[in-house]
């Protein structure tokens, strides 16, 4: 996906504590302590969305290193989109778990919004299904 806008990805805080800290700070990532409820991070992300910034969230909460196309989703992405009126642009990546990562492929879904009165459980399931479908499409592209 080509965009002129910077995507500020939520990233595990350990990346900001590594020798590559400079890179993640320069890239504009937002550190997340995955072991605790991170209201402060969500408030920062919400404020950034309301100011027109783009936030990237891995809704599974981590990279998926299993055989399953998608793990259960956390609620941060749908909750933020519902609260701020931001668009969700589903994106899935395949081909990153092998020894050779030269065949990585992405698939991007249609942007959509979540209604202010929508049920978050249902919206999370809708997002999960969209991501699973996109993952299968991306995986097929890795075989080409």
Language-model features, listed with the residues they occupy:
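Non-catalytic C-terminal accessory region of glycerolipid acyltransferases
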Residues: 42-144
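Glycine-rich, highly charged phosphate/nucleotide-binding loops
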Residues: 36-42
């Amino acid at each position: 996906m080509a965009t002129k806008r910077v995507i500020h990805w939520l990233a595990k805080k350990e990346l900001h504590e590594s020798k590559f800290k400079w890179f993640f700070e320069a890239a504009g990532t937002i550190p997340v302590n995955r072991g605790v409820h991170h209201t402060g991070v969500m408030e920062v992300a919400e404020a950034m969305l309301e100011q027109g910034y783009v936030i990237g969230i891995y809704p599974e909460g981590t990279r998926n290193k299993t055989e399953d196309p998608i793990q259960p989703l956390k609620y941060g992405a749908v909750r933020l989109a519902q609260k701020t009126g931001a668009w969700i642009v589903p994106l899935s990546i395949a081909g990153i778990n092998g020894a050779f990562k030269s065949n990585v492929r992405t698939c991007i879904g249609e942007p959509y919004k979540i209604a202010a009165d929508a049920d978050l459980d249902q919206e999370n399931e809708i997002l999960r299904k969209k991501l699973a479908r996109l993952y299968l499409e991306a995986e097929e592209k890795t075989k080409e």
